[in-house]
Amino acid sequence: MMDVAVSFEGVPIRLTHERWFHIVENHDDVAGYYDEVLETIENPDLVLRGYRGTLIAVRRYGRRRYFMVVYRQVSADDGFIITAYFTSKLDRRHIVWRKP
């Protein structure tokens, strides 16, 4: 089983149930945010350049709380989610896209 969200560049990004369980295992505070992971890919406030070719979709939750979803676009028609987490830190030097 899996769900798919479309990135800001129009690339379908997969979230398998196995990957979701892995994410929740390492970030239990994200456990109730399955739909928000997909929504963050589809409607981010901004996207950051991550490490080793990854992208990070970001949604703001409150004044200094950000929801980060790390993903990789393998091709123009395929990608997958790596992890998701909350943070209070945001490195604005790596912004590649911002919601208009």
Q: How would you describe each model-predicted region?
A:
Residues 1-100:
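Ribonuclease/tRNase effector modules and their secretory precursors
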